[in-house]
Amino acid sequence: MKIFTHRSKLMYLAIFLMIFDSFRPLLFSLDTSLYLSIVGRIVYPILLFLFADSFYHATNKKKIMIGLLLLSWLLSLGYGLIDHFIVPIGWQNYENIFMTLLIVAMFNVGTDYLRKYRKQLGRKNYILRFQGIGMILLPFILSFLVFEIGMFFLKPTFSKAIVYYIVGAVMLMLPSLFVVHTGVMMVILGWLFYIFRKRRGIQYLLILVYSIFSFLLHPYSLQWTMVFSIIAIHFCHREKKTWPPV
């Protein structure tokens, strides 16, 4: 289990596999792609777990978030080039792991502000409270903005080409919930990993509960296979390393 003790290597491997998982449907047949998706299902919770621990110890969270935003734009550019020159994807099907981590980071920063507010002694600084709530609500506000822009350009007065490129560009540039990898629930899972960072048993329980519900609701989606990520997470030593790992 030596690989699981090297958090930096595991972090890079998880990111690479998640990017691979994003392009997987374009590279393989439907049957092969379905079975390969198991890798992404298992790696995703591991990445969220490592991100929660690393982000907590990071000294410059703002720099991390800017880096994630730039990486998300770079990945979106890759999607756009493939969509235009190789295989039509459609921006509706884009899944951006870096944008997902950015939104998780926004929730985490909001949580930090609220924790600082709660720990204050004497007169409370309500600015921290508003900053915390604002950071948590910001992804939802931006998602609503993206939705409204999309509805505006869907009017018959605009051509389909304008709608496709403008709405697609806005959706891919702004941190919205429309392009998160595997859905909003995984963002919430990553946020809960951060909240319960020191309670590994609760983290295991979160993965287990999510896997059970996924199996009961959609057994053929293979999302439930993420339960096996608990094995890898169990052998991850809690080393205090910042994000990105060095």
Where are these regions (language model features)?
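Alpha-helical transmembrane segments and their immediate juxtamembrane cytosolic regions
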Residues: 1-246
